[in-house]
């Protein structure tokens, strides 16, 4: 199975590549080239930095229409990580109101947790699972993942696979059809993070066989 990690100068691509290499024998390509993206079995959209800068980079590399064609029209599985998850939504208020990819209804807002909690939210936090038969079915007692972010995704409940508590309940992971997002960093979340990536890739294999995920 060929996995393409989208390279648009805004992501921690090597850490994600190394994490996947620990999971199994996959063909992993880090690229922003159109033909390579079209040939992928699934895509990973990483992201570190500011939302407006990321959208500008995607636009400059002429990736927005291409990715939309692959993901929305051809229904290629995609995993957005951290900022990459936020880009999947309609807009973000980071720095200035900026239009996102718009693949999932929802908007990205600054965290306002109250209770003297610090922003950015940095460190380990426990997931609250919202759905059965999801990508996180492997989790048992330990549900901790590593987060680094100042904004969160405000979206309808039906798209949420998991949330976390930080003053208020916020979105940790989403899924809409072939589109999956993880606000935490699976590549930095040790065993749980590797298993989250493995679960996503196993789900991709199921999609390739034409079997829907419950």
From Swiss-Prot:
The keyword Protein biosynthesis does not apply. GO terms for biological process: L-histidine biosynthetic process. It is found in: Cytoplasm. One of its GO terms (molecular function) is imidazoleglycerol-phosphate synthase activity. One of its GO terms (cellular component) is cytoplasm. Keywords: Amino-acid biosynthesis, Cytoplasm, Glutamine amidotransferase, Histidine biosynthesis, Hydrolase, Lyase. The keyword Amino-acid biosynthesis applies. It comes from the Bacteria. Heterodimer of HisH and HisF. This is Imidazole glycerol phosphate synthase subunit HisH 2.
């Amino acid at each position: 199975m060929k996995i393409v990690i989208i390279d648009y100068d805004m992501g921690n691509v090597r850490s994600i590549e190394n994490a996947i290499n620990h999971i199994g024998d996959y063909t992993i390509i880090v690229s922003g080239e159109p033909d390579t993206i079209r040939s992928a079995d699934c895509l990973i959209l990483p992201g570190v930095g500011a939302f407006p800068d990321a959208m500008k980079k995607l636009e400059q590399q002429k990736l927005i229409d291409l990715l939309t064609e692959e993901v929305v029209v051809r229904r290629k599985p995609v995993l957005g990580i951290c900022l990459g998850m936020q880009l999947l939504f309609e807009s973000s208020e980071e720095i200035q109101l900026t239009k996102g990819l718009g693949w999932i209804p929802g908007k990205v807002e600054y965290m306002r947790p109250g209770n003297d909690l610090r922003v950015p939210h940095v460190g380990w936090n426990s997931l609250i699972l919202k759905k059965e038969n999801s990508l996180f079915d492997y989790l048992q007692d330990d549900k901790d993942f590593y987060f680094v972010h100042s904004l969160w995704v405000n979206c309808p409940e039906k798209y949420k696979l998991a949330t976390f508590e930080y003053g208020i309940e916020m979105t940790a992971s989403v899924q809409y059809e072939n589109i999956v997002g993880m606000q935490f960093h699976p590549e930095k979340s040790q065993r749980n993070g590797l298993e989250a990536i493995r679960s996503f890739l196993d789900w991709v294999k199921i999609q390739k066989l034409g079997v829907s995920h419950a």
